[in-house]
Curated annotation (Swiss-Prot):
It catalyses: 3'-dephospho-CoA + ATP = 2'-(5''-triphospho-alpha-D-ribosyl)-3'-dephospho-CoA + adenine. InterPro entries: CitG, TriPribosyl-deP-CoA_syn. HAMAP family: MdcB. Keywords: ATP-binding, Nucleotide-binding, Transferase. It comes from the Bacteria. It comes from Pseudomonas aeruginosa (strain LESB58). This is Probable 2-(5''-triphosphoribosyl)-3'-dephosphocoenzyme-A synthase. It is an enzyme of class 2 (transferase). Gene3D superfamilies: Triphosphoribosyl-dephospho-CoA protein (1.10.4200.10). NCBIfam families: malonate_mdcB (TIGR03132), PRK01237.1 (NF002315). Involved in the formation of 2-(5''-phosphoribosyl)-3'-dephosphocoenzyme-A, the prosthetic group of the acyl-carrier protein of the malonate decarboxylase. GO terms for biological process: prosthetic group biosynthetic process.
Length: 293
């Protein structure tokens, strides 16, 4: 684990700070995980000419105040309603602006602000109920509410969603992050139990998400052909024994090569891996803030 704070070992006096630390840790750990197919990692920029690992790390750190304020707002408000949704929406836009100032206009974590912001708020609403499915379901209830101040979307993701008829990040959140909860996390735990090291277990979790996600980042860059390459290739790695096996490693290298040739990067899956890492750690550290509630 990249340790901004070793949260599992250190009691947390402030719930919002603890949740913000967890969220930023998850983003940095996702960025540093290597070798990820066609994504920024310790090896290089993947399919991104405008990104590098240092920028991803700086971007993640810039979002700490945003996540802290989201957690504080949810804890103060104490219930899911339109007012909370509006507050969280504005905080997310403020966080995005801070991110863009840090990155000089490069979109590094817009999707992660949405996913992790919802999960941070959901965890703060009921901090003693930290099981992944419960937290993700609460986040989904928040996401179901419309934010009246949100601009009409014309992002790459929104255009892809309309063109290809896929749900995108909004639908994934509204459903309670099923690709993270039902695919990523179970694979993470299975790989650990099977003896894989932590980095390989996380890679396998990413691949499990990639195998089932209609990733709008890949669709935007490479269409249905690219999506099939991503999903089929991820399944092939897992079927060959996962990233910890020699056969799986060879398949992973092939998937990386094919996605790079298409200039297709599974950014949506990366955001959901960060969500998995956040949810995975949450129960283990929740005892640290019990005294502050």
């Amino acid at each position: 684990m990249n340790a901004i704070a070793n949260l599992a070992a250190t009691p947390c006096a402030d719930l919002g700070e603890c949740l913000a630390d967890l969220a930023v840790d998850a983003l940095i750990d996702e960025a540093e995980l290597s070798p990820k197919p066609a994504l920024v990692d310790r090896r290089g920029n993947g399919a991104h000419a405008d990104l590098h690992l240092g920028l991803m790390q700086a971007s993640a750190l810039s979002l700490w105040p945003c996540f802290k304020e989201m957690a504080d707002a949810a804890q103060r408000h104490g219930r899911i309603d339109a007012r909370l949704r509006g507050v969280l929406g504005q905080l997310g836009r403020d966080g995005e602006a801070a991110m863009l100032r840090t990155t000089e206009g490069v979109n590094t974590h817009r999707g992660a602000i949405w996913a992790l912001g919802l999960l941070v708020a959901a965890a703060a609403l009921e901090p003693r109920r930290t099981q992944a499915g419960e937290v993700a379901a609460r986040a989904g209830r928040i996401a179901l509410l419309d934010d009246p101040a949100a601009a009409i979307g014309d992002s790459h993701g929104e255009r892809v969603r309309r063109r290809y008829g896929v749900g995108g990040a909004r639908e994934e959140a509204r459903l309670g992050f099923p690709r993270a909860v039902r695919h990523g996390l179970p694979q993470l735990w299975r790989s650990r139990e099977g003896g894989a090291g932590e980095q390989n277990a996380r890679l396998d979790a990413l691949l499990a998400i990639m195998s089932v996600l209609d990733d709008t980042c890949v669709l935007h860059r490479a269409g249905r052909v690219g999506l099939a390459v991503m999903q089929d290739g991820a399944r092939a790695v897992l079927a060959a024994g996962g990233s910890a096996s020699l056969a799986g490693r060879r398949r992973l290298c092939e998937l990386d090569r094919r996605l790079l040739a298409l200039n297709a990067s599974p950014g949506g899956a990366a955001d959901l891996l960060a969500a998995c890492l956040f949810l995975d750690r949450l129960p283990a550290v929740s005892g640290g803030w019990a005294g502050s509630l």
